């Protein structure tokens, strides 16, 4: 009745095939867009939350966050900060109703060079999840992969049992430092690396296997697997499905709803390109990085230096936009009285 097994297999979507060897994660704050793709986990960031917070469907969450900020009181700045943390957690809690795994919630990018402030803010976010009845085991705290961010991740993991997702990761130096810090997961970016090469070199298009972002994640994956690091490698920031397919077999891949939709409609055959076995044969050598060596090696990578600082600025700008939006909603009525 349902056709031959061969025919059925042939019609299997690229998304379903990908799920056989890679954990698929949805990269969105728009949790209504998650259902049909059935991801294991989800990731958010300040830009995605800002976009979702402006959608009519999510105004109740925004109102709830505002009410929470006001209820805690204190100076206006404090109320806004509390409202934003609450908003991130409300979105995370709604997403968790739709997925079996974990959600990633980001610490304010403006704290990217302040280890202690990142640790404190992360603990506050976990506390808010706890108030909402959600265990820290279902949360990944996202931190910028600066030296300070990586050390904050190490402290959160070792001293507080808080799982971290190191983001804005563009260089091999960042990946090595994260592995040595023993964080739960890293998010090496793919598309933003491609963007830099397209903007700064004469080559304007790449085959997926030659894509500089794909090559970066492949090298990081091979290094982690060759030397037995437990940290999960989650490729992030994709510009097209070709990049995703070229990283099939990576531990996790976090993908926007738009590209998840394209993979769902695509029935071409997909085979893993990354594997632990292949990683063992790579010619990578193990290195150790203290702070000085990290800063030097990272600084040697012009693309990574520019994209890390650009990424922090972009997330910070969107955090400021979100603050302004909430400030207007929280205080303009009062000021207008």
Swiss-Prot record:
The modification N6-acetyllysine is found at residues 115, 219, 269, 286, 321. The gene is Taldo1. Catalyzes the rate-limiting step of the non-oxidative phase in the pentose phosphate pathway. Catalyzes the reversible conversion of sedheptulose-7-phosphate and D-glyceraldehyde 3-phosphate into erythrose-4-phosphate and beta-D-fructose 6-phosphate. GO terms for biological process: carbohydrate metabolic process; fructose 6-phosphate metabolic process; glyceraldehyde-3-phosphate metabolic process; pentose-phosphate shunt; pentose-phosphate shunt, non-oxidative branch. Pathway: Carbohydrate degradation; pentose phosphate pathway; D-glyceraldehyde 3-phosphate and beta-D-fructose 6-phosphate from D-ribose 5-phosphate and D-xylulose 5-phosphate (non-oxidative stage): step 2/3. The active site is at residue 142. It is found in: Nucleus; Cytoplasm. Keywords: Acetylation, Cytoplasm, Nucleus, Pentose shunt, Phosphoprotein, Schiff base, Transferase. This is Transaldolase. Belongs to the transaldolase family. Type 1 subfamily. One of its GO terms (molecular function) is transaldolase activity. SUPFAM superfamilies: Aldolase. The first 10 amino acids are essential for nuclear localization. The keyword Amino-acid biosynthesis does not apply. Its EC number is 2.2.1.2. Homodimer. Interacts with KPNA1 and KPNA4. CDD domains: Transaldolase_TalAB. Pfam families: TAL_FSA (PF00923). One of its GO terms (cellular component) is cytosol. It is an enzyme of class 2 (transferase). A motif (Nuclear localization signal) lies at residues 1-10. The modification Phosphoserine is found at residues 237, 256. It catalyses: D-sedoheptulose 7-phosphate + D-glyceraldehyde 3-phosphate = D-erythrose 4-phosphate + beta-D-fructose 6-phosphate.
């Amino acid at each position: 009745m349902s056709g031959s097994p061969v025919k059925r297999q042939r019609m299997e979507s690229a998304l379903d095939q990908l799920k056989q060897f890679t954990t698929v994660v949805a990269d969105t704050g728009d949790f209504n867009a998650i259902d049909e793709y059935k991801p294991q986990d989800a990731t958010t960031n300040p830009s995605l939350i800002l976009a979702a917070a402006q959608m009519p469907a999510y105004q109740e969450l925004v109102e709830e966050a505002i009410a929470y900020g006001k209820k805690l009181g204190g100076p206006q700045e404090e109320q806004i900060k509390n409202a934003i943390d609450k908003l991130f957690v409300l979105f995370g809690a709604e997403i968790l109703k739709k997925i079996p795994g974990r959600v990633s919630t980001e610490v304010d990018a403006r704290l990217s060079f302040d280890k202690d402030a990142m640790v404190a803010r992360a603990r506050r976010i976990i506390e808010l999840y706890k108030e909402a009845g959600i265990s820290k085991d279902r949360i990944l705290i996202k931190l910028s992969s600066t030296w300070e961010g990586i050390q904050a991740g190490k402290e959160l993991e070792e001293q507080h049992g808080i799982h971290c997702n190191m983001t804005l990761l563009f260089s091999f130096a960042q990946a090595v430092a994260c592995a040595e810090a023993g964080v739960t997961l890293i998010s090496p970016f793919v598309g933003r690396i491609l963007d830099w090469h397209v903007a700064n070199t004469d080559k304007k298009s790449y085959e997926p296997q030659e894509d500089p972002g794909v090559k970066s994640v492949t090298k990081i994956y091979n290094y982690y697997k060759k030397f037995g690091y437990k940290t999960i490698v989650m490729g992030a920031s994709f510009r097209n499905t070709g990049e995703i397919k070229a990283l099939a077999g990576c531990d996790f891949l976090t993908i926007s709803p738009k590209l998840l939709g394209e993979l769902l409609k695509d029935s071409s055959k997909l085979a893993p390109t990354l594997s632990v076995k292949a990683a063992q044969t790579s010619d990578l050598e193990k290195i150790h990085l203290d702070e000085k060596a990290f800063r030097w090696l990272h600084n040697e990578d012009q693309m990574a230096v520019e994209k890390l600082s650009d990424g922090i600025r972009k997330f910070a700008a969107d955090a400021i936009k979100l603050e302004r939006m909430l400030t207007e909603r929280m205080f303009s009525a009062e000021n207008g009285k």
